[in-house]
Regions:
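Membrane-interface segments at or immediately adjacent to transmembrane helices
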Residues: 60-73, 264-355, 360
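Hydrophobic/aromatic packing residues within the alpha-helices of TPR/SEL1-like helical repeat arrays
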Residues: 65, 107, 143, 297-298, ...
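Boundary/linker segments of alpha-helical solenoid repeat arrays
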Residues: 72-80, 116-123, 135-138, 145-161, ...
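Register position in tetratricopeptide repeats
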Residues: 96, 130, 320, 354-355, ...
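Hydrophobic alpha-helical transmembrane segments in integral membrane proteins
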Residues: 242-288, 490-497
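Transmembrane helix recognition focused on a "late"/terminal membrane span
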Residues: 449-495, 499-504, 519-560, 578-657
Length: 657
């Protein structure tokens, strides 16, 4: 049945006409319907469906949907977003009317016709959730399917990259603050102790404390901004950190160095998203373009007729809009200039195939299988040629051509097999630009194109220069400045200096104030009290035990506070550096995604259609991280060294001699 006949039948919407439509013979298996020069648009088919549904003619409405599905396959349209949004609107109306099953059917139809539209998947998830407990798992699957289907699309990939970039920047900023705060609490007293020793007893504690605060807040005091404080603190304390803490600090400094390129790439994508021609090209590649899109592409072709990419996009847009005659004329003009143009030859043959001109299509497909053709072109030509043989019931030739296509490009042919009619027959496939080609063609341009004739082998300009330019910023300068600061602090302390916190009482001690050799990270009194177990008077023992108890209580309280406020920071404070960093990455990563989605939304699904699973999953992940961070804590910072062997008394040694 031709599309024009179907449209006429649907527009009449009378019982007699509907009955007559049922009696019209459908094409035999393997024979594709022919297309007129101007086929029905999807707007016309959708209007026919709406009228049939409003008239209560279920048969005509079903026929309209089948024709929409058939036309989508014939024109190789990945996602009918316009029709999908119409079905989503109907599903929402059914949900408001408490007609859950009808709403589910509408959303399923939207998912089938527009798999790249997240609204249909979200609406289906909401409708399934209204089933009750038995609809929970299918609802989660529908929501996950919506994300996985939208992600490969042009808009989905662009939104995902923007969301990931913003979330990564926010997460690194939060992690840097948490790590700097934990290490400041853990190691800041060592710097304060060295300042005390450097100023001497004549200056008093208040002078060293004031100098300590001035050093910590120097970026704010010099009007550089409070955002630099985490990296400044890490550089200031770098000489006091152990190797694990230094490794984490270096990772954060490297992340700061990557801020410039990340922001530059985000700016490039945002400039691309402001290009109206980019959105027109994207619609021509993965949707059914409307008249405005076609007009914009026609204007672009008129301004640059030598850019074949724009010509291919215009031809694809015209064919997917049902304007077969105009699309054929576009390809004929290309072939008049270059008879060997593989894209124009294949796509013109597909239009002839849709019109029933199998012999002329066969001749053009065979030209594409000649020696010297690119593998993807030859595989596509063999694949389309096999369908011509199938129309003629030439099964041996069909199998031979299909085998050649599978041999040349098995992955490509497997992708082509998704274009399958309800009758289980396959559709011929166009050649042209992919989503990735469209992204590269318009990358970084707010108007016009960035690369001409990408399909002819032109490559995008190298972004090495732009990457190098993005590294010249304050963040790169800060890395050098902080390296200099860490070096100066190390030179100020001296090469043989050490400053430690006693692992038991928490007292800070250094080379100047410590007598004897350091063993096990303990001060002299704790070493004699807990290891030698001798040489400490009773009152001193009692005072030291009270200090140990206060230090343990202080460490436990600080661990709880840090873990409650910033899960993972407590582990960093108590010495589980890498485990704490992993918890911080999970905590701030989830939080950053939630915040970034408000700034650069991944999808445009309205809130009323958004299922609760993604926020609920994020909440459960945050709860799990918080529970783990507060449940598991490190033991003491140090283990006591072995007790030294007692020396034999001189008298006993002489008697033994």
């Amino acid at each position: 049945m031709s599309p024009s006949v179907v449209l006429g039948v649907l527009l009449l919407l009378s019982p007699q006409t509907a009955g007559g439509a049922a009696g019209v013979g459908t094409p035999p298996p393997g024979v594709a319907p022919s297309a007129p020069a101007v086929a029905p648009t999807f707007e016309e088919l959708w209007s026919a469906f709406v009228k049939a549904d409003a008239a209560g003619n279920a048969e005509a409405a079903g026929l309209a949907l089948r024709e929409i599905r058939r036309t989508r396959i014939e024109r190789n349209i990945p996602s009918l977003d316009g029709v999908g949004l119409g079905l989503v609107e109907r599903g929402v109306a059914k949900l408001d009317a408490e007609q859950r099953e009808e709403a589910e059917d509408a959303f399923r139809a939207a998912v089938g016709l527009a798999p790249g539209l997240p609204d249909g998947h979200a609406g289906l998830a909401v409708a399934l959730l209204k089933k009750g407990p038995f609809g929970v798992v299918p609802s989660i699957e529908a929501a996950a399917s919506g994300v996985s289907s939208f992600l490969p699309s042009g808009r989905g990939a662009l939104g995902a990259r923007n969301l990931a970039t913003v979330a990564a920047l926010l997460a690194v900023f939060g992690i840097a603050w948490a790590v700097a705060g934990a290490l400041l609490v853990r190691r800041g007293g060592l710097l304060l102790h060295d300042l005390d020793e450097w100023l001497g007893p004549a200056q008093g504690r208040s002078a060293s404390l004031g100098l300590f605060l001035l050093l910590l807040l120097l970026p704010v005091a010099t009007f550089q901004g409070w955002g630099w404080l985490p990296l400044w603190v890490l550089a200031l304390l770098f000489a006091y950190l152990d190797w694990r803490e230094r490794a984490l600090a270096l990772v954060l400094l490297a992340a700061a160095l990557a801020v410039g390129p990340a922001v530059a790439s985000l700016d490039l994508r945002l400039r691309t998203a402001r290009n109206p021609l980019f959105h027109a090209a994207l619609a021509a590649v993965e949707s059914a373009p409307d008249a405005a899109v076609i007009a914009r592409l026609e204007e672009a072709v008129r301004s640059d007729r030598e850019d074949l990419d724009l010509v291919y996009l215009l031809g694809a847009a015209l064919r997917r809009a049902g304007r077969y005659g105009e699309a054929a004329e576009v390809y004929r003009q290309v072939l008049a200039k270059d008879p060997a143009n593989a894209v124009a030859r294949n796509n013109l043959a597909n239009i002839e195939f849709a019109r029933g001109g199998y012999e002329s299509a066969r001749a053009r497909y065979r030209e594409g299988t000649e020696a010297g053709a690119a593998p993807e072109v030859a595989a596509t030509s063999h694949y389309n040629l096999s369908l011509v043989h199938l129309q003629k019931f030439e099964y041996q030739a069909y199998n031979e051509a299909k085998s050649n296509a599978d041999r040349l490009a098995p992955g490509l042919v497997a992708d082509y097999d998704r274009w399958r009619y309800d009758s289980r027959d396959y559709a011929v496939v166009d050649l042209g630009l992919t989503r990735e080609d469209v992204r590269d063609k318009f990358a970084g341009t707010e108007a016009g194109v960035a690369v001409r004739n990408l399909s002819a082998g032109a490559r995008p300009a190298s972004r090495g220069g732009a990457l190098a330019a993005s590294l010249v910023n304050r963040f790169a300068a800060s890395v050098g400045l902080f390296a200099l600061l860490a070096f100066l602090v190390g030179r100020w302390r001296g090469p043989k200096a050490f400053t430690l916190h006693c692992g038991r009482c928490g007292t800070a001690f250094c080379r100047s104030c410590h007598l004897g050799q350091v063993s096990g990270g303990l001060c002299s009194q704790c070493y004699h009290l807990f290891v030698v177990r001798d040489g400490v008077s009773g009152p001193a023992r009692n005072r030291k035990m009270a200090e140990v108890q206060r230090a343990d209580g202080r460490r436990d309280r600080m661990f709880r506070v840090l873990s409650v406020l910033s899960p993972g920071a407590g582990q960093v404070y108590r010495g589980w550096t890498f485990r704490g960093a992993a918890l911080l990455a999970a905590w701030y990563g989830v939080l950053a995604l939630l915040v970034a989605d408000r700034v650069v939304p991944f999808t445009e699904v309205p809130r009323r259609l958004s299922p609760p699973w993604l926020p609920l999953g994020a909440g459960l992940a945050l709860l799990a991280v918080w529970a783990i961070a507060n449940r598991f804590r490190p033991e003491r910072d140090v283990e006591l060294p072995a007790r030294p062997a007692r020396r034999a008394r001189p008298a006993a040694a002489a008697g033994a001699g």
